[in-house]
């Protein structure tokens, strides 16, 4: 009997956004340590900077057309349309070169054209979600809605506040639709994202202890294995990928601050802040009388390069009381003993990193999944304070004092430390995420 040849090459297809690219690379590193080799097809739109080091990764180029800016939904839809044919040609060429030695394709859930190509070429394929299981369940709920009826229903206050079935405390008005322009194109995107096609399983960068009910519901709805492998950034396989230049001078400044006194402010790699909001944030932080480390990314303030948009006297006080950088070594900062809280946009990567370092959060979400994460941080895990609506300095000051000075903040810190230990236990031998990774590897070897 002919011995079965074990396929060891895996094709990874990340979405070309930092918050999606980084965990996909961390997943790839985990699989490299399990004996697989990783191939990453990339076009001009998502080419990795050549200065970055990804040992064990093979990057290959696929031709693509120039994307037009049509907003987040339009750009994603366009990307999936224009990339399918060239990706298919790329995979066919790979199959010829590698002698069919391709174990599977693992693709970001928003790069769903890969699922169609894998189906046509009869290749095993797995969906990777860099967001929460709760977000994926919400996409399933949204995919079944009729846009016109939903908009009419949502005019009723009772409907807005109705809890989504088996999703307490999420209400229908909490479903992530508000920031994506017209509703129907967004619902159509949800339908494409939740269409599992021939996928063998779904891989999620989350942890069972954080989302057990959402994971159970997702498993029931999809009827294929769901592997929660998170937090990927703290597995032994993770190497702390970053594609932005970090300013480590802030660590020296942190060394001079009192324990748990500093508020770390970072709104991720994509959020755009208005000048007025920045001014209110600055005054609120100054009035709180707490030191702060503030990441102001170039281009993150509308019509300005950053702190220059503040009045001169305010800018001077900010530089005296706080420390400003363009980008920070976030995991190292969150793990520093002087950091007592994280003012965050509540992106999922930042949320996991904060919990792993035992740092409670002030939640200022801007769009989509961030809103869901903020609700869970405040109402389910009870380790966050949400600041909503139009930002004003008084709300900033109150939130900082609640977290750093009041007993409420101390209780949040205790709960965060409990979750920290649970998340770290999940990746150790016998932990839920460690077991899920082993099961995934076993699954990959049987495809």
Curated annotation (Swiss-Prot):
Record's keyword annotation contains Transferase: yes
Chain positions recorded as UDP-alpha-D-glucose binding sites: 269, 328-330, 345-353, 367-370
Family (UniProt): Belongs to the UDP-glycosyltransferase family.
Entries under Pfam families matching the protein: UDPGT (PF00201)
Enzyme superclass (EC): transferase
Keyword field: Glycosyltransferase, Transferase
Protein name (database record): UDP-glycosyltransferase 76E3
CDD domains, sorted: GT1_Gtf-like
Organism lineage string: Eukaryota, Viridiplantae, Streptophyta, Embryophyta, Tracheophyta
Known EC number: 2.4.1.-
Family matches, as InterPro entries: UDP_glucos_trans
Entry keyword Transferase: yes
GO MF entry, a single one: UDP-glycosyltransferase activity
């Amino acid at each position: 009997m002919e011995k079965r040849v074990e396929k060891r090459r895996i094709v990874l297809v990340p979405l070309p956004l930092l918050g999606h690219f980084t965990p996909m690379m961390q997943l790839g590193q985990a699989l490299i340590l399990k004996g697989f080799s990783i191939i990453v097809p990339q076009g001009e739109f998502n080419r990795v900077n050549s200065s970055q080091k990804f040992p064990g990764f093979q990057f290959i180029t696929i031709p693509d057309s120039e994307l037009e800016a049509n907003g987040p939904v339009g750009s994603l839809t366009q990307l999936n349309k224009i990339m399918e044919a060239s990706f298919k040609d790329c995979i066919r060429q790979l199959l010829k070169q590698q002698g069919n030695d391709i174990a599977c394709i693992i693709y970001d859930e928003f790069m769903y054209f890969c699922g169609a190509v894998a189906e046509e070429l009869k290749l095993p394929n797995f969906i990777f979600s860099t967001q929460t299981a709760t977000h994926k369940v919400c996409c399933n709920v949204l995919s079944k809605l009729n846009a016109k009826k939903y908009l009419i229903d949502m005019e009723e206050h009772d409907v807005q506040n109705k809890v989504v079935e088996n999703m307490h405390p999420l209400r229908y008005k909490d479903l992530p639709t508000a920031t994506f322009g017209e509703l129907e194109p967004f619902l159509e995107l949800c339908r494409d994202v939740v269409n599992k096609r021939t996928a063998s399983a779904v891989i999620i960068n989350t942890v069972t202890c954080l989302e057990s009910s959402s994971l159970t519901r997702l498993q029931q709805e999809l009827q294929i294995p769901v592997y929660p492998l998170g937090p990927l950034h703290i597995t032994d396989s993770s190497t702390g990928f970053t594609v932005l230049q970090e300013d480590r001078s802030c660590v020296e400044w942190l060394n001079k601050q009192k324990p748990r006194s500093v508020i770390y402010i970072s709104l991720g790699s994509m959020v755009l802040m208005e000048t007025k909001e920045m001014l209110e944030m600055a005054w609120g932080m100054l009035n709180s009388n707490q030191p702060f480390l503030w990441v102001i990314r170039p281009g993150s303030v509308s019509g300005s390069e950053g702190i220059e948009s503040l009045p001169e006297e305010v800018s001077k006080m900010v530089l005296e009381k706080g420390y400003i950088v363009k980008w920070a070594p976030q995991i190292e900062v969150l793990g520093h003993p002087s950091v007592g809280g994280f003012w965050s946009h509540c992106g999922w990567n930042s949320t996991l990193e904060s919990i792993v370092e035992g740092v409670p959060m002030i939640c200022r979400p801007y769009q989509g999944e961030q809103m869901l994460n903020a609700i869970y941080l405040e109402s389910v895990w009870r380790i966050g304070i949400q600041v909503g609506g139009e930002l004003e300095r008084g709300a900033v000051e109150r939130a900082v004092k609640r977290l750093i000075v009041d007993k409420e903040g101390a209780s949040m810190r205790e709960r965060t430390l409990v979750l920290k230990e649970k998340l770290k236990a999940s990746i150790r031998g016998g932990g839920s995420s460690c077991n899920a990774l082993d099961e995934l590897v076993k699954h990959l070897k049987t495809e």
